[in-house]
Amino acid sequence: MSTDSIVKASNWRLVEVGRVVLIKKGQSAGKLAAIVEIIDQKKVLIDGPKAGVPRQAINLGQVVLTPLTFALPRGARTATVSKKWAAAGVCEKWAASSWAKKIAQRERRAALTDFERFQVMVLRKQKRYTVKKALAKA
């Protein structure tokens, strides 16, 4: 009697060389970098030449793993990381992601002036009114 078992890949993001990370604390907060080398359980070596992140060892508590990865040899130099980053189109993929769009929207809303916030409120009221009107017709 044979039973077929299905091997399924994990859904969580693994700490691996070539994984793109978003730095959430420190001097380079909000910038993207790639994991170049895993130092130990809590630290990795990152490099982000396109985003202006210097090559540095960073604690995993200071970064967020993104779903983006690209092929990168272990311990790659900055020039290699830069070439592979550009070839994989990481910046374009990140800009197209809903995560990046949400961050951009949050920054845009934080930068609104009082009058712009008022305009947003008026537009939301207009939208709500048209929806109510359409529901009343139906």
UniProtKB/Swiss-Prot annotation:
Keyword Transcription on entry: no
Residues annotated with N-acetylserine modification: S2
Changes after translation: N-terminally acetylated by acetyltransferase NatA.
InterPro entries: KOW, Rib_uL2_dom2, Ribosomal_eL14, Ribosomal_eL14_dom, Translation_prot_SH3-like_sf
GO BP terms in the entry: cytoplasmic translation; maturation of LSU-rRNA; ribosomal large subunit assembly; ribosomal large subunit biogenesis
Extra remark: Present with 35100 molecules/cell in log phase SD medium.
PANTHER family to which the protein is assigned, alphabetical: 60S RIBOSOMAL PROTEIN L14, LARGE RIBOSOMAL SUBUNIT PROTEIN EL14
Subunit structure: Component of the large ribosomal subunit (LSU). Mature yeast ribosomes consist of a small (40S) and a large (60S) subunit. The 40S small subunit contains 1 molecule of ribosomal RNA (18S rRNA) and 33 different proteins (encoded by 57 genes). The large 60S subunit contains 3 rRNA molecules (25S, 5.8S and 5S rRNA) and 46 different proteins (encoded by 81 genes).
Protein name: Large ribosomal subunit protein eL14B
Protein source organism: Saccharomyces cerevisiae (strain ATCC 204508 / S288c)
Upper lineage: Eukaryota, Fungi, Dikarya, Ascomycota, Saccharomycotina
